Amino acid sequence: MRKIAIVSFQGEMSCFVHALLNVWNYHERGYETALIIEGASTRLLSDIPNSPKGELWGKIKEAGLIKSVCKACAAQMGTLQEAEKQGLPIDSALSGHSDLEPFSRDGYEIILF
């Protein structure tokens, strides 16, 4: 089974939604899929649940596809408490940021958004 890790960095909702759409698409097609939320995209954690794509966000969360939210970036963007409230996996293994190396080691192809 192929493994895909999608890393969302951009802070625009349209870019984040495209990352979500692709994560779900790969998941539905049988890929082992991971979503890593980094950089400015962590700012959107407060907005996405009540957005037009909130239902998709809920499905992705329920399926356990969100594997990492950058602790340093979420703190900088003011959404760390929101990430914790949503029960998202917080990662600070790389000097406070999400560590991509374990995904590479585990054979994931990494796609950046």
Residue spans of the language-model regions?
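Anion (oxyanion) recognition and catalysis
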Residues: 27-28, 61, 84, 104
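C-terminal structural segments of small proteins and small subunits
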Residues: 80-113
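Residues at the starts of beta-strands that form the adenosine-phosphate
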Residues: 3, 31-34, 66
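Mid-chain, well-packed structural core segment of small domains
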Residues: 49-90
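Short hydrophobic segments within beta-strands
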Residues: 7-9, 36, 113
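Short, glycine-rich nucleotide/cofactor-binding loops
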Residues: 4-17, 42-48
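Short, glycine-/small-residue-enriched flexible loop/hinge segments at domain edges that mediate gating
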Residues: 30-47
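Histidine-anchored nucleotide/phosphate-binding helix
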Residues: 15-30
